[in-house]
């Protein structure tokens, strides 16, 4: 066999026969030379026909011819590889895959020894089966979820397609079964993940509905009706001071200080001032009551803790006042004795003038004693039962012994303890003492209080 250039090709050798047998067994592991394949399949007549079809057999390479004219038996080989450029194959549909020439293959420099390209087949890809429906966003509650579970994201499962394990495309009943298999709009068919996890969709929906039903009555019970809450709100909103009078007073004070502002329309400010005044007055009243209690109740003495049943506890203030009265009594006795020495007083107690004065004094004392017996006012110690055993009776006897006959002629029956006439009431002194501890806004009030104070 001779080529187009006149060179003779060697006859087939045992190695060529072995390669032919391997090719027939379908081995695709070792690359195969294109020239050997052409020689083995076409023979001398086939090659000459290809050269004649190419039009330029002397200058054009055999592989530069149109690949469409090659026999289908050569193009269906799976063990063809390319040593320089990779060649792709088209696998769309059921058409016969054909090799594709690249520009680098065409621009191969002409030389005496040209390496033949070895073509490798591309992996067959499965045909893409278009989905019957558009993907549904199951996480969006506004999208209509037909025959599906609300809130369950199954978009990734909806987009799944059944793999085509056959070389051809799937038709007929097989495609319908695959679509029914991966269709997730029916909750009963989600058995791949939910059943394995042990989730019962129907039971979960019933529990959610039951929880929402149980929450509704509790919310209604906690919220009171308008008729029940209206009186309480009105009581809380009642201000301590009248809003009109408070706003008028604040506007007058602001005008005196050069501020032109109307406070009548600002209700929040009026409520704040009313609450502040209430707190300040409460503080002053509490402090006044405490001072009045301290004034009426002194520090208890450590001695004579056990008092008689009819004995009245005396305060330290009453005792001090009594001591001052005793000193004044002694000074008065000294003054009367000096008047007697000067002849200004009668020493004789049995004179007529002294008897008349003593009778008037006794008559006045008798009337006062009768009034005490008929009323609930303070009584003398001798008017109460068992008074002879008390300490007050002994004190009265000592007072009688100390009593001067000169003062007795004037109707002085001796000194007694001065109890507080105000009782448990709060006086102006207590209020002024409470205001004196304040720092601001009390100067005028203190001056007016001391001006009106009566001893």
UniProtKB/Swiss-Prot annotation:
It holds the Pfam family TAF4. InterPro entries: TAF4_C. It comes from the Eukaryota. It is found in: Nucleus. Residues 1-12 have a biased composition (Basic and acidic residues). Residues 247-323 form the Histone-fold domain. Residues 1-37, 80-112 are annotated as: Disordered. GO terms for cellular component: transcription factor TFIID complex. One of its GO terms (biological process) is DNA-templated transcription initiation. Keywords: Coiled coil, Nucleus, Transcription, Transcription regulation. Residues 83-112 have a biased composition (Polar residues). Residues 314-370 form a coiled coil. The 1.2 MDa TFIID complex is composed of TATA binding protein (TBP) and the 14 TBP-associated factors. Belongs to the TAF4 family. Functions as a component of the DNA-binding general transcription factor complex TFIID. Binding of TFIID to a promoter (with or without TATA element) is the initial step in pre-initiation complex (PIC) formation. TFIID plays a key role in the regulation of gene expression by RNA polymerase II through different activities such as transcription activator interaction, core promoter recognition and selectivity, TFIIA and TFIIB interaction, chromatin modification (histone acetylation by TAF1), facilitation of DNA opening and initiation of transcription. This is Transcription initiation factor TFIID subunit 4. The lineage of its organism: Eukaryota, Fungi, Dikarya, Ascomycota, Saccharomycotina. The gene is TAF4.
